[in-house]
Amino acid sequence: MTPPERLFLSRVRGTPLHLLLLGLLLVLLPGAQGLPGVGLTPSAAQTARQHPKMHLAHSTLKPAAHLIGDPSKQNSLLWRANTDRAFLQDGFSLSNNSLLVPTSGIYFVYSQVVFSGKAYSPKATPTPLYLAHEVQLFSSQYPFHVPLLSSQKMVYPGLQEPWLHSMYHGAAFQLTQGDQLSTHTDGIPHLVLSPSTVFFGAFAL
């Protein structure tokens, strides 16, 4: 009489290879990861199959914001979003001209301003101009505005040609949910307000 284990082995050996592979595939499929639609609800799986790029984008979005200066405000630097190339993404909000940090983490914070002016008249006495731009942090840990990034420059207008100066700075900071990011600028009447010259933003790393 043939032992049961030998009988089972003989049946396996006699099974066509393609049937064995099919059975193995059916066992592995429920635990497969990274395949479109696997491990998702029926509606989510259908969305992933129909719009794979959209599904990937929703799973990788991080908090980010990019603001530009409002050119209609000549005597103040007012930030605006949702216009031109400015935006608020994944929790960032703009309130009282400050960015509100949506979640705790490490963020890259950046800002740029560009100043310009005319040459002075030969009959006038040239007056040096003080230009400065600063990104500030206000949080529950520091109940006052703490400078994060700052630049300063003294400009001496020339006699022959107009002048132009830019300031850019950016760095990574550990921020807490609810922190407020704002700016302070000296020399606002000389700002060149356009989307490519005056901007302020942050994004999660």
From Swiss-Prot:
Domain called THD: residue spans: 63-205
Keywords of the record: Cytokine, Glycoprotein, Membrane, Secreted, Signal
Localization of this protein: Secreted; Membrane
One protein family per Pfam: TNF
Cross-referenced InterPro entries: TNF (IPR006053), TNF_beta (IPR002960), TNF_CS (IPR021184), TNF_dom (IPR006052), Tumour_necrosis_fac-like_dom (IPR008983)
Primary location class: secreted
PROSITE patterns: THD_1, THD_2
CDD domains on file: TNF
Keyword Transmembrane in record: no
Keyword NADP included in the entry's annotation: no
SMART domains the record matches: TNF (SM00207)
One example of a Gene Ontology biological process annotation: positive regulation of extrinsic apoptotic signaling pathway
GO cellular component: extracellular space; membrane
Signal peptide positions (record): 1-34
GO molecular function, one term: tumor necrosis factor receptor binding
Function statement: Cytokine that in its homotrimeric form binds to TNFRSF1A/TNFR1, TNFRSF1B/TNFBR and TNFRSF14/HVEM. In its heterotrimeric form with LTB binds to TNFRSF3/LTBR. Lymphotoxin is produced by lymphocytes and is cytotoxic for a wide range of tumor cells in vitro and in vivo.
Subunit structure: Homotrimer, and heterotrimer of either two LTB and one LTA subunits or (less prevalent) two LTA and one LTB subunits. Interacts with TNFRSF14.
Family per record: Belongs to the tumor necrosis factor family.
Name of the molecule in the record: Lymphotoxin-alpha
Taxonomic lineage: Eukaryota, Metazoa, Chordata, Craniata, Vertebrata
